[in-house]
Amino acid sequence: MVLDKPKQPLQLRDVEKPRPAKGQLLVRIVTCAVCRTDLHVADGELPDPKLPLIPGHQIVGYVEEVGPDVPSSFAIGDRVGIPWLGWTDGECVYCRSNRENLCDRARFTGYTIDGGYAEFSVADARFCFHLPDRYNDVEVAPLLCAGLIGYRSYRKTADSRRLGIYGFGNAAHLIAQIALYEGRDLFVFTRPGDMETQQSAEALGAKWAGGSDDMPPEKLDAAIIFASVGPLVPAALRALAKGGVVVCGGIHMSDIPSFPYADLWEERVIMSVANLTRRDGEEFFDIAPRVPIKTNTETFPLEDANIAFDRFRAGQLSGTAVLLISKAGHPR
């Protein structure tokens, strides 16, 4: 599926099969989960995408060909995941200080390089992950962005005991499971009046769930905002205890309104999360099967990607949309 221009439907099109260059894997794709970032790209909310573009960055597939100088840890037939961060230069001040997620020359899968809404993709082997055997090809796909970016956001809350989560979509649902596994007190904020989602959060184990316009029964040590809604930032600040942190976990957010300095005072912090690092992935794919994190998915054939987009925009999905692309000769 190809995006020719933002704000236009994706087009089903035959494209040339890619060939792996030095350090790259050729991957036959079996599934690719749909992320809200894909919508931001398709809707023109993120600047300067590669065009025409094959979207998708939660890619699960099997290695079909290995390019020159690929590490011996990868072999033909291996199942791999291809995430958002697709390449960094390894030389800049950020890469040399273990902050490759901030590399000025970074390339991003399904944004500045072609992604996974296709039968094949090439990817830099350094940024591919071996995936836990516990999960099948559909279950594991949402972990490659909602899980990874969510986990990086979660790490920024350190050892905060009282954790608030604003928005209870894909990433929040995954990270809530880790927080509960690690013994955090979880407070979940949804759209005002969304009793169904609040009940779902409480059934999962949240100590409290309410609307984003409510104050929690206790002050929070940290809050993660997964919804791309700027006014949630001052709302979360007001719910924080002294010294607390608000982590903005999305790549895009509507404008943040002004707020009194008193809401920020007493060493409260607002921070964003950008992209991910390979270390994030290694840690996350180690802990995910131990929790074990469970994913909720709804599948679509590749050619119905536009339908998946429309249902995502309308809030009509029952779980993470996952595109089914090829069985690749594998039963999983």
Predicted regions and their residues:
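Mid-domain Rossmann-like dinucleotide-binding core that forms the NAD(H)/NADP(H) cofactor-binding site
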Residues: 133-213
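C-terminal hydrophobic helical "lid"/dimerization subdomain
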Residues: 181, 278-332
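Glycine-rich cofactor phosphate-binding loops and adjacent beta1-alpha1 units
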Residues: 187, 195-269, 330-332
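Residue-level marker of beta-strand positions
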Residues: 58, 78-79, 94, 120, ...
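Glycine-rich beta-strand-centered segment in the early N-terminal region that forms part
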Residues: 16-32, 45-93, 127, 132-135
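Cysteine-cluster motifs in flexible loop/terminal segments that predominantly coordinate metals
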Residues: 35, 83-129
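Local beta-strand N-terminus motif with an aromatic residue
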Residues: 77, 219-221, 305
